[in-house]
């Protein structure tokens, strides 16, 4: 017997019972994006490797440890995308979408990182991201955060997420702080773990978000990044906080929040939860005003965020179980008798024409009434249409409410109107 081939570790199948809740959540997210004027952009999952090295940073964990990189048959180095912003910027430059233009874009799809798989963290995972180009004020930063807050309300999870904010300033401000932080860490190397010692010279700001409690205690004595902010960044951040206060959005300023990708500047933010164990970040983003120019375009202000859909689905299921998927089927058509199948299929097609939004499944594979009604229950149908030889002969169909058990014989010509009443 041939050996079964299974999915790659950390790359999961999502089966019909799971995808239904995904579809409902994604529909909610997309509706809110549309209400803010965002347009979808669809991007390749494979890009040239230098794109990510230049955008994310050569000495980040993503580039050093986590990317799926390979040579194609032409000898070109390609990478499965580990995040979406770099590809979105590349597309904007390539197709002339960014220079002297305002763009509000969103994308959705799989990303890939070679990490240790655990609940809420996978090697293939799905993100929804939104990016805004051409606007540099704190007002658009605030609107992006307001958009995400509207998502949480729509999904019934607003009480289970909290917003953390910081400003990491300009490139020059971070360089000055970096020097001061390295000097401080060099004096306390005995407290640092091996990972922090490695980061101390390659990417010292990442020491700030170390999970090591001894390192976090040590950092209480270090100077804060906020002490080194340039005046423009300080003013920008104050403006953002004022707008969020006016909108009634609660937040915590976390001066150790730096984000793991090198392209960020000024505003950074995360929505976090305590309901998913160690995988607490649900949505994160910030401003990246230098990235378009860094990737070959003209200087363009930009801000955006990305959200992990696996974690969002887990969170919705954990804290709002009433947010359930729509049933696969609204109506199940039961056909009994050798001469009824053709009539049943004809009636089903007519109802699909007259009721475009209805989910109607016709029974196939035969079976007596008991088996067919069991199938209707399996698919979650609210209504069964019963068509036997006598109904075919007199042009009627029996409409049965599967919740109340009530049933009525209705003329086939008027059954669509009757169904609309029942379905609301």
Swiss-Prot record:
Mind telling me which GO cellular component terms the entry cites?
A: cytoplasm
Q: Which reaction(s) does its UniProt entry say it catalyses?
A: tRNA(His) + L-histidine + ATP = L-histidyl-tRNA(His) + AMP + diphosphate + H(+)
In terms of SUPFAM superfamilies, this protein maps to: Class II aaRS ABD-related, Class II aaRS and biotin synthetases
Extract the Pfam families matched here. Answer: HGTP_anticodon (PF03129), tRNA-synt_His (PF13393)
Tagged with keyword NADP? no
Keyword Protein biosynthesis, does the record have it? yes
Keywords attached to this entry: Aminoacyl-tRNA synthetase, ATP-binding, Cytoplasm, Ligase, Nucleotide-binding, Protein biosynthesis
An example of a GO molecular function for this protein is: histidine-tRNA ligase activity
Enzyme nomenclature, EC number: 6.1.1.21
- Tell me, how does this one assemble? Homodimer.
Q: What is this protein called?
A: Histidine--tRNA ligase
* Species: Salmonella choleraesuis (strain SC-B67)
